[in-house]
Amino acid sequence: MSLLAHLQHQGLRQIVLCPGSRSAPLALAAGGLARQGELTLVTAIDERSAAFHALGLAQASGRATAVITTSGTAVANLLPAAVEADRSCIPLLLLTADRPTRLKDCGANQTVNQEQFLAPVCRAFLSSPGEGLHHENDVQLQSLASSLWERALGSAGPVHLNLPFEEPLHPSEAEQQAFWSAWQPLPAAGGEHHPAEPRSTPWDGPVPDWSRPGVVVAGPWRGLEADRPAYQRALQELALTTGWPVLLDPLAAAPQDLPGVIRHWDLMLPAGLPTPERSLQVLRLGPLPASRRLEAWLRALGPGQWLISEGDCRSLDPLGLASQCSLGLASWWDCVSPNPLSLAPGPSSLLTAWRDLEAAVAGELARQLPQAGPVSEPALMHVLPQLLPPALPVMLAASSPVRDWQAFAAADAGQRRCFSFRGASGIDGTLSLAVGLSRELGPLVLLTGDLALLHDSNGWLLASASAPPLLVLLIDNGGGGIFGQLPIPTAPAAAFDHLFAMPQAVDPLALARAHAVPTRQLASLEDLPQALEWGLDQRRAVLLRVCTNRGADAALRQMLRREVEQALCVVQGSTKEG
C-alpha cells in the first residue's frame, strides 16, 4: 500500500490493472486508493492491450502511468508496449508481481526469470527484496518510489519494478476495513513532480552559418508533454528568424501557425528540390521521418547537418552525417540563435521557391482526387482533414494511414496534433493506445486499416468499458495494403495475398457491435461529412467503415506520384526559362 501511495505522492494519477493472484496486494492497494479518490484505476484482462492503453494515457498526459500485472507470461506481454515506450521516449511504470526467490529455478508453478524479460528496453530495472516486499520499511519504499519516478521521467521511457510477494497474499475483509479506517493519505505533493531540470550546458559544437540557406526537418516529437510549449516557441522563433523551409512530419507537434511549413515534401522530393550552389545546411529535430526518399535526399546533401534531440542521448542518426545535441531545441536555440537584425527579414528565396512547388503539388492533387464518388485511400486522406474540427487530434495507424496522411492530406489542413507508432513502427496496440489517448485528451479520431484494428481487437473491451469519445475510421482494404507500396512482387495475386496481405474473413462491424460499439458503413465520399458529424456527436467509441480497393489504390498512388513529378518538372522548367 505504501509503495503506491508514495508513487501517487510523486505524481502518479492513473493505473491500469490486470488480473492475477500474486499481484493481489497491489490490486487491493490500487482499488483502495481509487475509492479514496487518490487516482484513477482502469482494469484490463489482456496485458498487452493494458500496456498500450497506459502508453496512450502517458503520452497524452506527459505523466508516467503504471501497469500492474501478475507473474509469469503476463510480464512477457508487456514487451511490445515497453519497446514502443523506449523508442518513443514515453514514461511508463511496469509493476510486476513475482514469486519469492526461494521458488525460483526449482520448477515452481508460474515462476519464471521475468527479471530479464524487459531489461533491454527499460531505462532501469528495480526490485524489492527477493524474500518479499514486506521486508521494506516506509523510508525504503519512499526511496524506491522516488527512484522509479525519476528514472521514468529523467530520460523519459519505461522502467520495470519487479515485486516478489510471499504468501499470504489476501488479507481478510476485516483486516482491510481496519486498514482503511486508519488510513491517512500522504500530504499533497504540491503539484506534479518532475525531476529537477538539468543545468543549461552551453553548446560548444559546430553552429550553422545563419547567413547561408538551410532547411529544418522536424521529425516525430520525442519529449515530455511539459517541454512541448518551449519546443514550439523555439521552433517558431527559429523559422521566423531564419526564413528557412520546414519539412514537417505529421507527428512533429509543431505550433499551429508555424511559418515556412512545407507539407508535401515527400511528393516533391522525386522531382528534385532546388538547392543553393553551396551545400544546403540541414537542422534535424528528433528522429528522421519514415521516408526513404527523404533519407536518400539527406544522404546526397552530405555533411553540414545538425540533429537536436529532446534529452535523448542515444544516437538518432542512421545516416551518420549530423552533429547531435541532446540539450533540446529550446536550450540549443538559446545558445546559438543569431541576432535577428543580422538577417534579412521574411522568407528566404529558397522557401519562396519551394512554396511555388508545393502550390503546384496541391493543385495537382486537387485536380486528380475527387471530392465525391467511390472512396480511395488517397482521396480520403486528402479530404478528411478539411472535414474535421481544426483542434481535433488524430491517431494514424503505423501502416498506410500515416504514410497517406503525410503524402496526400491537404496542405491547408494545419499542423493538427497527430499520434502514431513511429518509434518501433509496429501495429501492436493500435486501438488500445487510441482509447488511452482519447480518455486523456477527449474527442479523437483513429485512422486504421483492417489488420491493425483486428490485431488489437481486445482494445474494444477498453473502449466499451470506459466509453471514451473515440471515432474509429476503419479503412478496410481486405488485408495489408502497405505491402503493395513496397518493392515486393505482387504476382501471382493469390501468393501475394497468402504471404503478405493476409486478408481475414472477419466482419469488423459485427465485432464492434459485439462490444456494444455503434457502427456505420460508408459507401462513398459524399457519406463522410454526415457520418463524421454523427460519430463525433455520440461522445463515445464508434466505428465508421469504408471499403477500398487495395490494388486500385496502389496503382493510384503510383499514378499520383508520376503526375506530381511531371507537374513539378514543368514548373521548374518554366522557372529556369524565365
Swiss-Prot record:
SUPFAM superfamilies: Thiamin diphosphate-binding fold (THDP-binding)
One GO biological process term: phylloquinone biosynthetic process
Disordered: region residues: 186-208
Involved pathway(s): Quinol/quinone metabolism; 1,4-dihydroxy-2-naphthoate biosynthesis; 1,4-dihydroxy-2-naphthoate from chorismate: step 2/7; Cofactor biosynthesis; phylloquinone biosynthesis
Cofactor(s) essential for the protein: Mg(2+); Mn(2+); thiamine diphosphate
EC number: 2.2.1.9
GO MF entries: 2-succinyl-5-enolpyruvyl-6-hydroxy-3-cyclohexene-1-carboxylic-acid synthase activity; magnesium ion binding; manganese ion binding; thiamine pyrophosphate binding
Keywords: Magnesium, Manganese, Metal-binding, Thiamine pyrophosphate, Transferase
One Pfam family matching this protein: TPP_enzyme_N
Gene3D superfamilies listed in its UniProt record: 3.40.50.970, TPP-binding domain
Record note on cofactor: Binds 1 thiamine pyrophosphate per subunit.
Catalysed reactions listed for this entry: isochorismate + 2-oxoglutarate + H(+) = 5-enolpyruvoyl-6-hydroxy-2-succinyl-cyclohex-3-ene-1-carboxylate + CO2
Function summary: Catalyzes the thiamine diphosphate-dependent decarboxylation of 2-oxoglutarate and the subsequent addition of the resulting succinic semialdehyde-thiamine pyrophosphate anion to isochorismate to yield 2-succinyl-5-enolpyruvyl-6-hydroxy-3-cyclohexene-1-carboxylate (SEPHCHC).
Summary of subunit composition and partner proteins: Homodimer.
Family membership: Belongs to the TPP enzyme family. MenD subfamily.
This protein's name: 2-succinyl-5-enolpyruvyl-6-hydroxy-3-cyclohexene-1-carboxylate synthase
Organism: Synechococcus sp. (strain WH7803)
